[in-house]
């Protein structure tokens, strides 16, 4: 234990010494750069030696407190004396610039050299990390020889990654023919949660993962499914398409083509063996976020895999037919919106002699379900989807107004209308007049009313000088001077300057007399005539 501790202490001291030397070099280079930039130097004072230490002058308080000042700092240029502060130095720009660049490069080497020396010693471990993260490869190649870092062309190409245990299944392939565009393309935003796939006794000839050509942000990484290819045709504004696929077992079957092929068409490697694949083609509408599709695990045992696909309408995908009969079945999954898909048609497979029956399903092709009840009014034939709405409508035929206002006694057929009416009474009391107590619905009307108490008439006619409290009254008055009469009676053709006068005139033709005297019962067409009549009583 004693020897090991002593060795560790020696190693720590050595590291500390190296670090101090490096810091001293950086400091020396920095001060030399300052000298080249400013042209100011420092005088080296002669210090008295007491043993091995050099003491600063006792007259300088800065040296006593801090251990050194500007005038007594030891020069870092080999001990030669420099010019005193404030002296004029001839500047040689070209030489100084070159020296400054050299000093900067030396400082950078001192700061970064330690990391790259450590990486060189741990080269084997770092190479494994580069294989997992290809982005580090380009950074490494900027500093080191590419022949050292580049992967061996005889290395193995990964065919499948198991997300659960991070196990990598690889086979020997020539990486010189490997698709290098995969590193340049971004992974698609298609989240596929895949279970482990086992392939026993199967011929694996090709496995390609071809992501989308355009960059779509996503978090999940697609996992290749052995024996199945997932073709997702996405529209413009998709974020993610979550598909949870259960385990697929392939035993004693020929698997020649399997991969993940999104919208970007990338040619797969041609093979001589017959292609038998299970492709999932989803064409989605615009602006939808997620579609959750859970697919049960099909199994292939001692049989050839039949051609199966899930094709949404809108795009024809060329598939390879097989002699095995194709059964159509329905993927009945709850979708997010009625306008999401008009139809989903699925070409599925027969596994182990079991055939699925034919049943097609078009989710929510109509806005209203055909089995929805329709409530029809017996009076007018109007239909409603809710019985409550029909009952309210029937009251309009019977004039049944059971809901009445407690303040004005106005009646309504629906309680909702009564609630809305009561709010009017509340708003009428919102702006009361301080002089007479009259209430108004808004502040503008209250301000106009207050002018009646103050007698203010700010609007005057330029023709006759008559004043008015409101601008609208002034505009009506101006029509007398211009002689404008825009309102014409349709019966006799008589014209009027005011709409109110036209309405009174029309009552002469219709015989309507809505204003009646409460004492004698006499009726009048105009309210002004009624007021004149009431003065007689």
Swiss-Prot record:
SMART domains: ZnF_C2H2. GO terms for biological process: regulation of transcription by RNA polymerase II. The keyword Protease does not apply. A zinc finger (C2H2-type) spans 375-397, 403-425, 431-453, 459-481, 487-509, 515-537. One of its GO terms (cellular component) is nucleus. May be involved in transcriptional regulation. This is Oocyte zinc finger protein XlCOF29. It comes from Xenopus laevis.
């Amino acid at each position: 234990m004693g020897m090991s501790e002593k060795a560790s202490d020696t190693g720590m001291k050595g590291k500390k010494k190296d670090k101090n030397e490096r810091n001293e070099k950086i400091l020396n280079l920095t001060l030399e750069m300052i000298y080249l930039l400013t042209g100011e130097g420092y005088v080296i004072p002669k210090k008295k030696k007491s043993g091995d230490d050099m003491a600063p002058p006792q007259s300088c308080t800065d040296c006593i407190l801090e251990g050194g000042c500007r005038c007594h700092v030891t020069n870092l240029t080999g001990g030669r004396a420099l010019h005193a502060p404030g002296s004029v130095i001839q500047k040689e720009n070209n030489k100084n610039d070159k020296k400054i660049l050299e000093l900067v490069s030396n400082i950078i080497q001192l700061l970064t050299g330690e990391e790259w020396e450590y990486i060189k010693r741990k080269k084997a471990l770092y190479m494994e990390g580069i294989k997992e993260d290809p982005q580090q490869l380009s950074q490494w190649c900027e500093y080191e020889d590419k022949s050292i870092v580049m992967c061996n062309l005889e290395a193995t190409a990964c065919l499948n990654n198991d997300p659960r245990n991070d196990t990598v299944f690889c086979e020997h392939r020539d990486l010189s023919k490997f698709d290098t565009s995969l590193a340049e393309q971004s992974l698609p935003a298609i989240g596929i949660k895949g279970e482990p796939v086992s392939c026993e006794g199967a011929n694996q000839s090709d496995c390609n993962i071809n992501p989308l050509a355009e960059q779509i942000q996503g978090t999940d990484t697609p996992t290749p499914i052995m024996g199945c290819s997932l073709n997702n045709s996405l529209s413009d504004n998709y974020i993610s398409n979550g598909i949870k696929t259960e385990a697929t077992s392939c035993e004693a079957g020929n698997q020649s083509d399997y991969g993940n092929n999104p919208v970007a068409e990338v040619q797969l490697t041609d093979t001589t063996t017959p292609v038998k694949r299970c492709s999932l083609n989803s064409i989605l509408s615009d602006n939808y976020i997620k579609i959750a599709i859970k697919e049960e695990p099909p199994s292939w045992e001692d049989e050839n895999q039949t051609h199966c696909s899930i094709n949404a309408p809108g795009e024809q995908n060329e598939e390879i037919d097989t002699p095995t009969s194709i059964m159509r079945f329905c993927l009945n999954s709850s979708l997010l919106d009625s306008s999401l898909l008009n139809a989903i048609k699925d070409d599925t497979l027969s596994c182990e002699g079991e055939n699925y029956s034919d049943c097609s399903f078009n989710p929510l092709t109509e806005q209203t379900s055909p089995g929805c009840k329709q409530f029809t009014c017996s009076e007018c034939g109007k239909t409603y989807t809710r019985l409550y709405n029909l009952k309210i409508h029937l009251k309009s035929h019977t004039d049944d107004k059971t809901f009445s206002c407690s303040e004005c006694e106005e009646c309504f057929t629906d309680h909702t209308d009564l609630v809305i009416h009561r709010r009017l009474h509340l708003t009428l009391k919102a702006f009361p007049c301080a002089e007479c107590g009259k209430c108004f619905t808004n502040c503008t009307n209250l301000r106009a009313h207050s002018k009646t108490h103050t007698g203010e008439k700010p609007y005057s006619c330029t023709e006759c000088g008559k004043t008015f409290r409101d601008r609208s009254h002034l505009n009506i008055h101006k029509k007398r001077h211009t002689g404008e009469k825009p309102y014409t009676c349709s019966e006799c053709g008589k014209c009027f300057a005011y709409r109110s006068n036209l309405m009174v005139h029309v009552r002469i033709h219709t015989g309507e007399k809505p204003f009646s005297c409460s004492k004698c019962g006499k009726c009048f067409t105009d309210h002004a005539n009624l007021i004149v009549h009431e003065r007689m009583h």
